[in-house]
Amino acid sequence: LVCIKQVPDTSEIKLDPETNNLIRTGLPSIVNPYDMHALEAALAVKDQYEGSRVTVVTMGPPQAEAALRECLSLGADDAALITDRAFGGADTLATSYTIASAIRHIQRTMNREFQIIFCGKQAIDGDTAQVGPQIAEELGMAQATYACELSVDQAAQKAIVKREHENGYEIVEVPLPLLVT
């Protein structure tokens, strides 16, 4: 499963000169670039394991459907849009709780167990890097952040993750199920 977010295209940003706030009107939206990396990683794992499927989930306004359709065109198998006006302005904790609840619902209703949940390291419109780890916590899953390489050992039910950090890299073994950013 891949969590994505539709974000404003930062190459087109304009600020209101009086308030210094982002002018969103007419601003094109894109799939968060870091989430596109997560989708690429999920599709690479799918290619390695026969019978694997990639489901893409996003929380946002109805127009976020366009982001899901883009992911489907790139090879994702299923997509789910979590949308309600009540979610507008949600902080990272509310967002994480809502997405985790949707993941539980998808697992229950589709009788699927997600072994790996992929998230981008952060969204370019917030840069908090909190939603992925908070989803993992809400679901009680192991997590590995700042991953730059991932290999999966299904027989041993673990993943080997190369993580980037300020002093270089480290390689960690993490049990499945796993959330990786």
Task: Give each language-model segment a name.
Residues 1-181:
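N-terminal glycine-rich FAD/FM-binding segment characteristic of electron-transfer flavoproteins
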